[in-house]
């Protein structure tokens, strides 16, 4: 992903709102220790650009967890035309609580699992934490009912080959979004939360300004209920990320992204000193940050699921 607008601070006045009947079962089932362990395992695979051994090991891990948690597993495979030549791309989808109702609403939790084509780049946070937290979501979803069909989507080739200009970057998400549109399924998707770089020890999730505000408000509500408001939406920025292709086909979406990874300033990358640097290693990732984001996002899904039942 790439930052495309300067940071703007926000002063937030938050209050705790408690909804009647909130069970908390899904968000309480989230295991941050497992999310961190998965992050460590994925980072241990080394570099993970498409086609690499680390990339293939990550795919195998994802499929193994989806099989164990009894997800309906689908693949979205295609060959992307890139500045580097043709590249095989593999989006992986795990579906939970699928019913026979062809109009059953869908909610997507997504994150990319590839890393840059850059020698020595491990991407423990950028690519590692997002893939790992989805694996922990799979375990939380296993055996728990929701009215919505929940999709976990691991997008591939999110990273640009040269730069996020024209059609370079977001290859997997662009393909999947267009596929949903062509199949007439986009209206069934009530929303998408994209998770990116959410393992940062100094967690500070941006209010990404192209994202769907009403869904951001649900996240803010969930964070307030859990006492996590200070970690969310304290500044605004605009990010070109995997949520953008879904917005373009009419799917509400939020980029849940920590856009300040390490020291900020004119002499470093616009998203922080560790962004796209070989210093994006496991020591920069925090189990506490994974817990804050994981519990908040799953409580947000619960709140949305409850509201669907009231319609």
Where do the PLM segments sit?
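Solvent-exposed loop/turn segments at secondary-structure junctions
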Residues: 48-50, 79-82, 100, 113-117, ...
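N-terminal capping segment at the start of a domain
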Residues: 25-59, 69, 114-115, 195, ...
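A non-catalytic alpha/beta surface segment that caps or lines the substrate-entry region
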Residues: 37-97
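Active-site-adjacent substrate-binding region
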Residues: 54, 79-81, 191, 200-311
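Soluble non-cytosolic domains of exported or imported proteins
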Residues: 29-36, 49-60, 124-132, 167-171, ...
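Bacterial Sec-dependent signal peptides at the C-terminal "C-region" and cleavage site
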Residues: 7, 13-30
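Structural recognition of the beta-strand scaffold that forms the well-ordered cores
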Residues: 93, 107-110, 151-154, 190-196, ...
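Acidic/histidine-rich catalytic neighborhood of metal-dependent amide-processing enzymes
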Residues: 117-222, 226-230, 238-243
């Amino acid at each position: 992903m790439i930052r495309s607008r300067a940071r703007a601070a926000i002063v937030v006045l938050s209050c705790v709102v408690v909804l009647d009947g909130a069970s908390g079962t899904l968000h309480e089932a989230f295991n941050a220790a497992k999310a961190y362990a998965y992050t460590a395992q994925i980072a241990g695979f080394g570099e993970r650009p498409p086609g690499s051994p680390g990339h293939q090991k990550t795919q195998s891990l994802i499929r193994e967890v989806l099989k164990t948690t009894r997800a309906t597993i689908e693949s979205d495979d295609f060959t992307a035309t890139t500045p580097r030549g043709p590249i095989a791309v593999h989006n992986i989808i795990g579906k939970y609580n699928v019913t026979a109702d062809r109009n059953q609403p869908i909610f997507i939790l997504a994150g990319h699992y590839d890393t840059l084509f850059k020698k020595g780049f491990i991407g423990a946070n950028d690519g590692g934490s997002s893939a790992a937290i989805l694996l922990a979501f799979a375990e939380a979803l296993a055996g728990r009912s929701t009215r919505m069909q929940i999709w976990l989507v691991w997008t591939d080739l999110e990273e640009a080959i040269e730069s996020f200009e024209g059609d370079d970057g977001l290859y997997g998400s662009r393909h999947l979004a267009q596929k949903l549109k062509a199949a007439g399924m986009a209206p069934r998707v009530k929303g998408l939360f994209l998770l990116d770089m959410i393992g940062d020890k100094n967690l500070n999730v941006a209010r990404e300004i192209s994202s769907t505000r009403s869904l951001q408000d649900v996240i803010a509500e969930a964070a307030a209920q859990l006492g996590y408001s200070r970690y969310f939406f304290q500044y605004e920025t605009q990010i070109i990320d995997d949520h953008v292709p879904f917005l373009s086909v009419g799917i509400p979406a939020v980029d849940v992204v920590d856009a300040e990874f390490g020291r900020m300033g004119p002499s470093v990358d616009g998203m922080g000193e560790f962004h796209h640097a070989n210093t994006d290693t496991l020591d920069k990732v925090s189990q506490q940050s994974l817990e804050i984001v994981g519990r908040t996002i799953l409580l947000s899904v619960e709140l949305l699921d409850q509201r669907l039942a009231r319609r």
